[in-house]
Design a protein with these regions (language model features):
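Compositionally biased terminal segments of proteins
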Residues: 1-247
């Protein structure tokens, strides 16, 4: 599992490597990544650790630059305590391909255990699209403010809620994360606004299917809360508004 401390350390090493590559003119002076999923929650301290790190980039061109940072094996690219940071691109990874990841990388580290990174281009899990609203709501955490080349931004908790809300109903860990987000506090009005936006940029059939997934997952979430003797009026209102507006 990847802890918050490991996340910060690994991205710091990647920024050093990216800065060296930028100084050679191999990549641009700035690359923006959007951290979603469990890595985002771990960095915020909302969960202890995550199995892998999910990142979204804006286009294939940025993916190419990030690929260079992750996989370039040059011995001159030593960072931190004189080490080389090299990831292996996992092309044949059926589970991740099924989810729609464009590229899956793994850093083999016998001392600190593996570090897995899934990189999506614009669209996540063949579902929601990284919109201008999502980018505008994202924040640059203090841990990454001093980076020179990588701009690792955290998408909002509301957008994480939506990303996790439209995954397969069988992903139990997403229900756990949705409970954490609900406990931490999210703005359902922001989510309704983003859903309206997604409805305009995603094809109607696909959008209807995604909203159906979200609706079913929210019903499961409400049932889990009820089994714990809990209730969220805000969640109830969101489910009702979702049903009236989209389902």
């Amino acid at each position: 599992m990847i802890t918050r401390e490991r996340l910060v350390e690994e991205f710091a090493l990647l920024d050093e490597k990216a800065t060296l590559l930028a100084s050679w003119g191999v990549i641009p002076e700035e690359i923006t990544l959007y951290l979603i999923g469990g890595g985002n929650l771990a960095l915020r301290g909302i969960k202890d650790a995550t199995a892998d790190v999910d990142v979204v980039v804006e286009n294939v061109r940025v993916l190419g630059f990030l690929d260079e940072v992750l996989t370039n094996p040059s011995p001159e690219l030593k960072v931190g305590p004189g080490v080389r940071v090299i990831y292996v691109k996992k092309v044949e990874h059926k589970y991740k391909v099924k989810l729609g990841a464009v590229s899956v990388y793994r850093k083999l580290d016998p001392e600190m255990r593996d570090f897995n990174m899934d990189v999506f281009v614009k669209r996540v899990l063949r579902g929601l699209i990284l919109s201008e609203g999502m980018k505008n709501r994202s924040v640059l955490p203090s841990e990454f403010e001093d980076f020179k080349t990588l701009r690792v931004r955290l998408v909002s908790l509301e957008d994480i809620f939506l990303f996790k809300g439209v995954t397969s109903l069988g992903r139990a860990k997403d229900i756990d994360d949705l409970l954490r987000l609900l406990e931490h506090g999210v703005d359902f009005e922001v989510m309704l606004g983003e859903l309206n936006n997604q409805g305009m940029i995603i094809g109607p059939e696909r959008f209807e299917w995604l909203v159906g997934l979200l609706y079913e997952k929210l019903l499961i979430l409400r049932k889990v809360l009820a089994e714990k003797g809990l209730r969220s009026r805000a969640l109830d209102k969101f489910i009702k508004e979702l049903g009236l507006s989209f389902v």
